[in-house]
Amino acid sequence: MLITNAELVDGRVVDLRVAGERIDAVAADLDRAADAASAADPDSDDETVVDADGNLLLPGAIDAHVHFREPGFSHKETWETGTRSAAAGGVTTVIDMPNTSPPTATGDAFDAKAAAAEAACIDYGLNGGVTGDWDPDSLFDRPLCALGEVFLADSTGDMGVAPDDFEAAVDRAVAEDVTVTVHAEDETLFDESARDGDAGGCGRDANADLWSAYRTADAEAAAVEYATEVGRETSADIHIAHTSTPEGIAAAVDGGATCEVCPHHLYL
C-alpha cells in the first residue's frame, strides 16, 4: 500500500509505503507508478494507493489502561464493543485492567478473560490483579503485561488491599520481573464530611463534585509517595495509574515512577 500526501506530526507532507505489516519507506515523493493501474483496476494485485489529502497520519495508539468489563459486566462493555470503539478512534493496542468478575487474580480467572478477549479486533494485553485471596503462583504463570491496577483503596470492584499485602505483591512482582501498576489513593485521607452532601455523597450515585471532594488530592499524593517509596526499597518498576493532580504527578516523577493521565482530568 502507498499512502500519499500525508502530514506527519512535525508538519512534513510525505508519502508512506507499507509492505506486509511493516512501514517500508517514508519520503517526500515515493514512486507512484502504481497509481494508474490501481485506479483502473482496484481489485488487481497492483499496489493500492490512498491519497491522504493532507490529513494527519499517526501510528496506532496504545491505550495501556482500559476497563472492558468482561467477564462479569458485559452489560457495560464487551471485548467486541470495546475494541471496535478503540479501532474507530485509532487505538490499535489496549491493556485491560483486572477488576472484572471474577477479578483477574488467579490463573483460572486470567484464562477466562483471555477466552473472552478472543472477540477483540485489535491487539491486546491483560494485567493481573491482587486481592486478599489471589493466587500469585498460577497468575504469574500467565503472560501478564503488568500486575495491577493494585488498589491502595477500594474503587470499582472492591479490590483495595492493605499495605502489608501491597508490599508482598510488589516483592513477588520484582521476583517475576513484572511492572506494578498502582491505583494510588490513601483512604485515611478521604474527606468523610463529603458523605453528608446531596446526591449520595461518595457512592455510585454521587455527582462529580462530591466524588472529587471525598477522594481528596492529598489522598492521591500521599499514596503515590508511599508506592514509590516501596518501589525504591524493592527496586520495583512502579507505574501510577490515572494521576489526576499536579501533586500526584510530581510525587511520581520525584519517586522514579512512570505515570499516566486521563484526557478528562486534563480538560474537564
Language model regions located:
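Divalent metal-coordination and catalytic microenvironments
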Residues: 6, 21, 54, 65, ...
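Short, acidic/polar
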Residues: 75-83, 131-142
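A glycine-rich helix N-cap at a beta->alpha junction
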Residues: 115-130
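Short catalytic-loop micro-motif centered on adjacent basic/acidic residues
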Residues: 95-96, 125-127, 236-242
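Metal-associated gating/positioning segment near the N- to mid-region
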Residues: 53-119
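Histidine-rich, glycine-flanked metal-binding segment
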Residues: 1-59
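Histidine/acidic residue-rich metal-binding segments in metalloenzymes
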Residues: 134, 138-150, 155-268
